[in-house]
Amino acid sequence: MMNFSDPCLLGPSACNEDFFEELAREILPTPEAKALAARLLRRLGWHPSEGQCSWCPEAYEYLYDLQFRYTGPVPLVRKHPGSALIVRWMLDGLGHFLFCRPRVQGNPLTYHLSCMGSAIRTLELFREQAHSHLWEQGNLVDCYWSCSSDYGYEGKWGQQAVVRGALSGPWPRPDPPSLQLQCLCAIWRTCLLRGQSQAQKYTNWICARHLQLRPDTSTRDSDLLLQRC
């Protein structure tokens, strides 16, 4: 099995033993809020991991470094999985950090936060018509690999800019964002503010293997569940 070549580096603050505990308290400050989040996640197909967490790098087999090159946050034209499926991916990330509690080992720590960040970035691009040209092959997909300074975390097209836009920009729909999406934005913002300055130069989508093991991704069912939450 090949290790992922470009893991995200959580900042040094994550070395504190109570990092995930404090993070959970900031996002879900009361037991009732945490219980509600757990119920919402379970309704959308998330289950607490038993033993090895399914979002840990060791759970994914890589035949070569660029195996999942085009399955990530900027898929090719006509291959976008749909916003409902992306929200499910984001909810899996929320469940991972709040309930699976990755063990803190080593310094610096390596965790694949690209899952959550890429999901937010994809949702942002998906709902903004002004970014439609970025989906075309030859633009963002190809240039991303040859212009890392522009498409890296701190570049003008990087995740930092997109995530900030998602957090501070106007919501384009008449109804407010779902509770789940607000939780995800909050936890991602907290990670940024608490030391994730080294986060993700690359945004390879590493949950492709995860989705192959969980094929139940009906857009209609997901939409119904999201409307009920």
From Swiss-Prot:
Task: State the compartments where it is located.
Answer: Host cytoplasm
GO annotations under biological process?
A: symbiont-mediated suppression of host NF-kappaB cascade
Quick one: where is this thing mainly located?
Answer: host cell
Q: Which UniProt keywords apply?
A: Host cytoplasm, Host-virus interaction, Inhibition of host NF-kappa-B by virus
Coiled-coil stretches: none
Q: Does the keyword Lyase apply?
A: no
For whether the record's keyword set contains Aminoacyl-tRNA synthetase, the answer is no
This protein's superkingdom?
Viruses
Stated role: Inhibits host NF-kappa-B activation stimulated by IL-1 and multiple PRR viral detection pathways. Targets host NF-kappa-B component RELA/p65 for ubiquitin-dependent proteasomal degradation.
This chain's protein is named Protein MC132
From what organism does this protein derive?
Molluscum contagiosum virus subtype 1
Q: Which gene encodes it?
A: MC132
